[in-house]
Amino acid sequence: MRAKRGAVGKVMMSGSRHNKLAESSRVPPLAREYISAMATDRELDRFMALSSTASSGASGSTHSCALGSVPPPGCASMEHESRPESGHRRRTKSSDHRSPDERGEAKEQLRELSVSPPPSKHKISQFTSPKSEVTKTKPNEYTIIPIVLASSPSFRSVAVTQTMSQSAEDIRTPTKSPQMQNKKTQTPESVLKSHKRLEWDPSADVGYCKRAMSMSNISTLERSVLEDCSWRQPTQQRPEANLDGVQPLLAEEPSPMLDKPTPPLACSTFVNRSERTKSLNSGMESSLSSNKGDPRKKCQRKSRRQDSEVSSCQTDCRSSSQKESTQGSSEAKDIRGNFTTEGTQCSYNRNDTEIDSIMEEEESIDRRKKDDLRISSRVQDPQISSRRPSVSSSRRESLSSYRRDDSRLNSPNSSRLGSEVSSRVESSRSSSRRESQTNSVYGSLSASSFDYHMHMAQEVEVLKHNQRRQQEMEVEPKKQLEKEQHQNDMQQGEPKGRELKDKNHHSGREQQEIQPLMRDQRKAEQRHEKDHQLEREQQGIQQLSKGQRKAKKREKEREQERQYTAAQFEKIRSNRRHVNKENQKPENPVVNPSTGVTASTSTTSLDVGSGSRPGGELDLGIDLLCSLVKSRSLSQGQKKKLVRDIARRISCLELTESSTSSRSLSSSSKEQLKVPTGSLQQVAATNTNQSNARSSSKAERIAPPVPAPRKRAAIGSSSPLPESVSYSGSTSGSGEVITQKTNIPNRNASTDADIEPLDLQDWLNPMTLSEIEFEERLKGGTDSERRRQLHWVKTEINRMQEFKNLLENISLPSKSQKKANTESATAAQIPSSMRCMGDQKERPDKEYLLRQEMSAEAESKEMENSETTTTPPPPVRIESVGVNVTNSDPSTLPAPPPTQPPPPPPHLNQRNLQNRKKMATPLLVSGSSTSGGGRSESVCSFVQQRQRQFREHYQNQQQQQFVLLQQQKLYQLQKQLNQQKDILIQRQQHCGQCAQCGHQRTCIHQQNCPRRQQEAEEQPDEREQYMQMQYAQAAGSAYATPHQSGSSGADKNEAIYYQVVNSQGVASYVQATMVSTETQNEASATGGAGGSAITRSTTTTTNSSSSMMCISSDMSVPMGMMNTCETTTTTTTHQYDDVACQRVRRGHKETTMNAESMQRQTLQVRPRAISYVIQFTPTGSSEVIEKPPSLQDQLQLARPEFCANAKQRKAILNEMQMIRNARRQELDNVLSQSTSMEALNRHLEQLPPPANTRVRLFTTREMKAITSKRCKNLPEVLAAQSRQEEEQRRRSNRLMRDVFNKRLKSRVASGQISLNHSMAIM
């Protein structure tokens, strides 16, 4: 490494104190010394001078950015004459590589150097070519980085207000290489182990294995030093994130660093100065000629790059130099050797015209440099002076990119454009989409949208320069001669272009086979063309004068633009057979007048040449606009001009098609009117466009000139060819709606795609079922459904009014009695109920009539059900508005036949959900379509409804608990009466024989239980009221009828069915119907008020008592004592907290049920929470079951001795406490009065004895005995005793074992080897 560095030459920042200038800079000396110390090992100076802050590997080579580098003497100086005093120099460290004479010469040369001005964003890049900007300097060149204090606000605003198409610093994670695209996500540890991309650097994030991997090549500290100098990234560099999207553009750039192998790890940031020995003029010539390159040569290079990508999957997509170096080391060396010559060989025609254009470009650049220098010295505004070179450089690079796009899309022989153009357009579309995705993810990094942020003064200057150059060019003569010469050049260049085009049409396998031969041919051609080009340059310089070259260049640009336009029109005409199917128009529209729906069958296209609509031109224009703008090297003026040209071409294309489209629209509308009326015709189709005829005509009239690429409006006109129909595959941006109905094969199907399986047709439609139905309701069936519902409501209102008049005319004997009852009931109401009745009177007539109509419908249904039972018919309900109620008999009442409920909406009839495989979204179909009923059934409104229901349920629970607390206070008054009787009975029992009374009570309880069960089986004593919410389902009628009697009741007596008619929008109503099934006598043996502790909760209904009703926004909730209620459904038993259902025990005064016993109530549901009172008329004096005994009472009955002892102990303790208090008081008095000890002793003898001597249950000895007895029986004591016994047993066993062993050994030792069992050793 050190030898290499010695050969290359070290460059370091002047960090020592003796090299500093007199005045200090903004960069502190400590930071400068730190960076210089780190730069010794990493050659950071050369890196900072020749690299950029963002990754320069994005463009395929190490772009250099000379930070105010001193040009050679041959170049014109573009710097001010005043050196900034705070600027610092960077000198080459030559103490160990140069002699003192060379150092002295270098110092003298440094004193004579011109001073670099305060650098702007784009002043840096004006020496470099637009794409490959390698500044070739001498090894001993001085690099000066001026550091200027941005004190003036005008200078500081340059970086703020300047909005050019340059990319910002990119410090994100590096994008994946093509080898890693299809692999799984790798952890940082596996990346380090497998690829070794990163290397730790203590001062920066510089160390990356590959040049293209590096995201920010210098540390934050070093970047702050550079930003302190107002240094910015050049215009044409791209961030790392856009590598994949900009590959086609990157691959065309020549890489000047190809002849240097990729250094390992952190060495990739080093720059070899030995390679930069050529002069700046030769570098500019080669870069200019490469940027004005031949389109055929670039096509050839593109095909070569495709060949290398096909043959080797290991190419690196991050640099174009590595793309072509993967074929082999020898081939890579040849390519590197010829790659620099390749740029000079690329010219539009291989003859004199290219030499002239090169010379013209050089002279125009020199002239612009001089003009810019003049302007910068004249104009004092630093914004304009810094803007000028950037405008000129961006103008040059935009010209080159324009020609490159031109050469990519343009070709003289248009007969060969057929399949090649289509494939190239597809590839450009995919690349543009990929880049747009990258930009959308990582922010707007490329100039995909136009930003015109130039100041007026700068724009005026640009326009003046353009006008001046235009006048100079137009004055030059001999334009006709150059035209003829240009035509000859075009004719000579045609055969070579044909040869290159034939090479591009090879397949992938053939390319792999003949790749070595093509490589050799290319190398030979490159050498041959290089020699020819040098000769042509010399001849062109001698032949043409400066004026002729200028005029010829101007004419050549015009001719290229004309050829470009002609090529685009040719591509449009040749691409019509491959036009996008989304822009084809449907054929054979069918109108169903019942819903006003146009159903157009869309099938596969039989004739590919049927695309005569301007959709292809629109797509091509949009893709062309995106591909040209994304090149991001266009200047502002060229962007505006480009957009205007494309918009003008598209508008011209649309004008030619407008007359035919209007004629086809009128003919299709006439055909639609001829379709006969009838039921909704179902057409088998993979897609169905449904819209109103008015909306389709509007979409036809208003066609946007340039629609968005993914929101193309499908115009509802038929194709001119009869057998061709089209797809419409994406959601249209206009008012038209893509829907799908039940797929039924029909004879109208014209192709095989129409008679696909129904499951396959479902998936051909991109919309979900909920979206389809929502769009259908918005367009088709809402108005007709609403009209049908309103018509049915009107007929029902008329029928109910006639029925009401009929009932009022009938008089019965019990009419006066019922009036008296209702008057007394309303007189007992709370004033809040009067207010509610007043509110009901003030409601509109529609709500009143709707409530009347619904209640009357339920009445008629109830009358039909009651005819089958033995009970008398229920009376007419009491209306809260004050309608007279009469009791009627079915024999005397001719009930008019009820009308059928309205049929469900048409979209429910059309849908056959069994055939559909997509998931159907659950719908809530409301009964009437008032208040936008169709829109309330979409997915969003369904979610909102669920959220609203949850909030109302929670609020309802809170309010219910609060109301229950208030009601419990009212019930306490009724409970106290019954509790007093129980207390009296219990006291009498306590005074007498407690045990016998308890035994008698248990016997009575055991005798009463089977008796009550027999009563419940034979003669049920309860009438249970269950609430069951009947919601209208989507498949059935919107109005649920009450079930038959006893369908969901446990005891099969009565059931109240609450039916929510419409719970959305307007105020809806709940119809509560009591269906009586049996009438039997009730004999209640026990009475008393009920409590809420048993499973059967009861309510007390007295003559004037009332139950509270808490109204939520969707349903009425009766508030009882119980918080939960059981609602028996068909499957399970649910617990509802918001509806309390009570079972009421009634009296048995009458053998037959009176008409007053069954009173139908109308519960009104309002959209907001309102509490009001509803009266329940009592049938007579009803008794309540007796309350179950409390735990204390049950303890008294079970263990009376324990209770007596407890009371005695409590009394003794209270007495002892009183005695202690009295003794304490007397003792205080004695102490306060006595003055001597004798008097104190005398008073103490007079004190009462202590409490424990006067009141005692047992003595101390008895207490100790009792305590010890209890302690001995404790489990801890017993366990300890057992433990001790076990230890004693083990100890004795061990002792016996030892004695036995000792005696046995002694016997054996004495010679007794046999042991008789009868002998006792122990």
UniProtKB/Swiss-Prot annotation:
Residues 1115-1322 are annotated as: Interaction with Klp10A. Disruption phenotype: RNAi-mediated knockdown in asymmetrically dividing male germline stem cells (GSCs), results in loss of centriole duplication and thereby leads to complete loss of centrosomes (and centrioles) from all male germ cells. In GSCs, results in the enrichment of both SAK and Sas-6 at the remaining elongated mother centrioles. Does not change Klp10A centrosome localization in male germline stem cells. RNAi-mediated knockdown in symmetrically dividing spermatogonia, does not affect normal centrosome duplication. Residues 354-364 have a biased composition (Acidic residues). It is found in: Cytoplasm, Cytoskeleton, Microtubule organizing center, Centrosome; Cytoplasm, Cytoskeleton, Microtubule organizing center, Centrosome, Centriole. Residues 78-111, 365-375, 394-408, 464-487, 495-512, 519-538 have a biased composition (Basic and acidic residues). Keywords: Cytoplasm, Cytoskeleton. Signal peptide: none annotated. Residues 165-189, 309-318, 338-350, 678-696, 737-751, 822-832 have a biased composition (Polar residues). The keyword Cytoplasm applies. Interacts (via C-terminus) with Klp10A. Interacts with SAK. This is Centrosome-associated protein Alms1a. It comes from Drosophila melanogaster (Fruit fly). The lineage of its organism: Eukaryota, Metazoa, Ecdysozoa, Arthropoda, Hexapoda. The gene is Alms1a.
